[in-house]
């Protein structure tokens, strides 16, 4: 059957993570997004030491898949080299096996050391929405200058809650005029 009523009762298991992910991607967007925390702030990766980055509790939507770091997790960054610069990427590594079992884990893509300006390492291509078996989603860059790891730079887009977006779509009506706000006022 090529058509399914996903939110209807079918009498047999028929809802997949792909179904839910496709719906969420349609509502939120096909990209990768960081959701606001319960404290109203967007969490950020920090450095604990020269070789340890701390990924805090956070919520992500990754190509329609909802993912959570439920307890802060430490990621190891390899030491830099004196006189060389490097960028490493902290990523969410998504895998889907031959039985369609999906898993995620934090992983580091190590950059190449250079005496010039560091560039991000190449992120292997892949898409959850296109059924790739492995997908790397960069969430933060760790700039390394010599043996010193710099301040992490968050790479994933921030997605504010819907309650903060209402004013951007609210109509204003006065007499015979209807005004729709588009952009900043």
What are these regions (language model features)?
Residues 13-17, 35-46, 74-86, 117, ...:
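Surface-exposed ligand/attachment interfaces on beta-rich extracellular proteins
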Residues 5-8, 53-174:
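Beta-strand-rich solenoidal segments
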Residues 12-15, 25, 30, 41-44, ...:
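Intrinsically disordered, low-complexity, compositionally biased regions/tails
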Residues 1-60:
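N-terminal "first-domain core" detector
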Residues 1-3, 23, 47, 154, ...:
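Detector for methionine-enriched segments
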């Amino acid at each position: 059957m090529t058509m399914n009523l996903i939110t209807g009762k079918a009498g047999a298991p028929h809802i997949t993570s792909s179904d839910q992910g496709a719906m969420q991607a349609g509502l939120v967007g096909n990209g990768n997004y960081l959701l606001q925390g319960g404290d109203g702030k967007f969490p950020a990766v920090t450095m604990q030491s020269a070789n340890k980055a701390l990924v805090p509790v956070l919520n992500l939507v990754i190509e329609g898949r909802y993912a959570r770091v439920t307890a802060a997790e430490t990621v190891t960054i390899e030491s830099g080299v004196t006189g060389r610069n490097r960028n490493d990427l902290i990523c969410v590594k998504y895998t889907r096996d031959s039985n369609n079992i999906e898993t995620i884990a934090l992983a580091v893509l190590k950059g190449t050391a250079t005496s010039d300006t560091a560039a991000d390492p190449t992120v292997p291509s892949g898409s959850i929405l296109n059924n790739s078996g492995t997908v790397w989603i960069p969430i933060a860059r760790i700039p390394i200058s010599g043996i010193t790891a710099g301040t992490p730079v968050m790479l994933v887009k921030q997605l504010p809650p819907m309650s903060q977006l209402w004013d951007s779509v609210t109509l204003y009506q006065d007499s015979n005029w209807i005004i729709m706000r588009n952009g900043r006022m």
